[in-house]
């Protein structure tokens, strides 16, 4: 009878296996050198070939180890260069080291334990439950979009073939989760561990039985800028274990099939057949039209929103209510909420895990399913804006007389809104933002948000709008989805960001 597969034993086995020892390599190199200089006998020749093969095998393992550590894919087919991989891994490690941060009292701390305490307190507060205000008001009159045919897709039973296909779609050497194993192990030894993996995954997907240990996650902190000083300057990225990634990916593949029928065309992120360039082109043409509008009494404005920690602030009750209102099957909703709400995680600081945080709100960044769930939440924001447009409270911007009026463009959490520059429409935008923020948990950072006015708007008329919105006025948005929004005569200045990005890679 085959012995049951144990994750604890597997973890212990992985921990005992380290990268090739430098001392062993030196001994083999010395042995090969001595044999090459020795008398040319058949016995010496056999020993020389055996030692050379052993040395080559160890050097190959060392190269693979450092290639995985360095996370470099663009030299995959190049010459062997272990020293390069080693230097890249060391460079990444130095860049990702946290040498100090400022705590809530603005005091600089540089001891690892103190940094860990600051990080733990910050994320415990960030992922704690806030009040769920005005949810019913926000979700009222929300029509079911999930048809009976669409319901059949997430409701049908899952299969072993589906699970295996998802595993082999994963990048084999992507960053491992808390159990220190990436997808390559499961792909390589599928004939050994496959049945056990399938049993665990199907037990949850088909019956809802969740092993909470599977949902333990490491959070790594990626700096947003060159000189991060506060925890808000770091982006938390989840490193889940492979079993849980399989569960999420299988469910995401089902949801992806019906997503285009649920998400508004103004949202281009992660939806099949939609491109980021669609939003870029529409935004560029709309802003260019506003820039060229020199005459007329009616002005227009574009509002670029900065949403603070968009994924981390999503309220679970809001997400659950959204799915019920859209008409998803109850069993599917229970599986999703089980994935979302059974999470626990530790923060990795300089290679070591600290704390055991159990959140009560927020969605993890890095999970494919949660990307789609965030779009379902953002759908309500789109619906509120569309309803305001249909009721005549919001008119947006039109490029020409018969062109459709554009009120908003969304890409993930990147939002660009358009309206007429008058008191009524500005108030409508403000009310909509307040309603959506209160019910969903989203926090609009008005200090980092900005507004751009059409050229026919006089400066004196802009002041009231700026005061009502509480944002800064700009001559042009610096960029939208990584590309310039307006291109004038100063081409060098406009495209200087391309040069900067190239230099960062060199």
At which residue positions do the language-model features occur?
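Conserved pre-motif C helix in the palm subdomain of viral-like polymerases
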Residues: 232-263, 281-287, 308, 331, ...
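Surface-exposed loop/turn segments and immediately adjacent short secondary-structure elements
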Residues: 70-72, 76-232, 238, 246, ...
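Active-site-proximal segment of RNA-dependent polymerases
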Residues: 134-155, 162, 209-218, 225-226, ...
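Basic, alpha-helical interaction scaffolds
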Residues: 1-14, 20, 463-506
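Catalytic palm subdomain of template-directed nucleic-acid polymerases
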Residues: 309-326, 362-363, 414-438, 453-462, ...
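Conserved catalytic palm subdomain of right-hand nucleotidyl-transferase polymerases, strongest
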Residues: 100, 174-181, 230-239, 280-324
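Arg/Lys-enriched, amphipathic patches
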Residues: 1-110, 120, 124-125, 153-156, ...
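Short, conserved micro-motifs composed of acidic
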Residues: 399, 447-474
């Amino acid at each position: 009878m085959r012995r049951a597969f144990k994750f604890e034993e597997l973890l212990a086995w992985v921990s005992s296996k380290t990268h090739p020892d430098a001392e062993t390599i030196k001994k083999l190199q010395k042995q090969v050198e001595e044999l090459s200089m020795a008398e040319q006998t058949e016995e010496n020749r056999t020993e020389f070939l055996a030692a050379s093969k052993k040395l080559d095998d160890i050097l190959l393992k060392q190269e693979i180890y450092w290639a995985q550590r360095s996370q470099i894919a663009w030299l995959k087919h190049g010459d062997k260069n272990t020293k390069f991989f080693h230097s890249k891994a060391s460079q990444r490690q130095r860049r990702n080291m946290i040498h100090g941060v400022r705590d809530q009292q603005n005091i600089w701390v540089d001891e690892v334990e103190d940094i860990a305490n600051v990080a733990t307190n910050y994320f415990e507060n960030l992922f704690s439950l806030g009040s769920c205000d005005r949810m019913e008001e926000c979700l009222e009159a929300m029509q079911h979009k999930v048809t009976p045919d669409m319901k059949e897709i997430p409701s049908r039973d899952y299969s072993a073939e589906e699970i295996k296909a998802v595993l082999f779609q994963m990048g084999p050497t992507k960053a491992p989760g808390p159990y220190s194993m990436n997808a390559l192990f499961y792909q390589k030894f599928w004939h050994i561990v496959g049945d056990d993996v399938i049993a665990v995954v199907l037990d949850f997907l088909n019956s809802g039985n969740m092993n909470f240990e599977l949902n333990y996650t490491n959070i790594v902190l990626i700096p947003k800028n060159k000189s991060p000083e506060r925890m808000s300057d770091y982006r938390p990225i989840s490193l889940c274990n492979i079993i849980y990634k399989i569960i999420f990916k299988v469910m995401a593949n089902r949801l992806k099939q019906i997503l285009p029928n649920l998400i508004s065309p103004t949202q281009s992120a992660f939806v099949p057949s939609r491109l980021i360039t669609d939003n870029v082109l529409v935004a560029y043409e709309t802003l260019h039209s506003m820039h060229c509008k020199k005459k007329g009494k009616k002005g227009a404005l574009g509002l670029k929103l900065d949403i603070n920690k968009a994924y981390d602030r999503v309220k679970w009750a809001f997400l659950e209510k959204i799915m019920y209102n859209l008409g998803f099957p109850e069993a599917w909703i229970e599986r999703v909420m089980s994935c979302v709400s059974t999470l626990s995680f530790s923060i990795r600081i300089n290679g070591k895990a600290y704390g055991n945080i159990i959140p009560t709100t927020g969605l993890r960044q890095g999970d494919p399913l949660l990307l789609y769930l965030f779009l379902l939440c953002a759908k309500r924001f789109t619906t509120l804006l569309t309803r305001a447009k249909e009721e005549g409270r919001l008119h947006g911007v039109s490029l020409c007389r018969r062109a459709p009026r554009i009120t908003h463009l969304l890409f993930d959490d990147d939002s660009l809104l358009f309206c007429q520059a008058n008191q009524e429409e500005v108030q409508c935008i403000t009310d909509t933002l307040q309603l959506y923020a209160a019910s969903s948990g989203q926090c609009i950072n008005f200090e980092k948000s900005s507004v751009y006015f059409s050229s026919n708007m006089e400066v004196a008329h802009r002041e009231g709008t700026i005061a009502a919105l509480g944002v800064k006025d700009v001559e042009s948005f610096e960029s939208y989805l990584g590309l310039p929004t307006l291109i004038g005569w100063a081409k060098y200045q406009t495209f200087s960001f391309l040069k900067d990005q190239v230099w960062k890679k060199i």
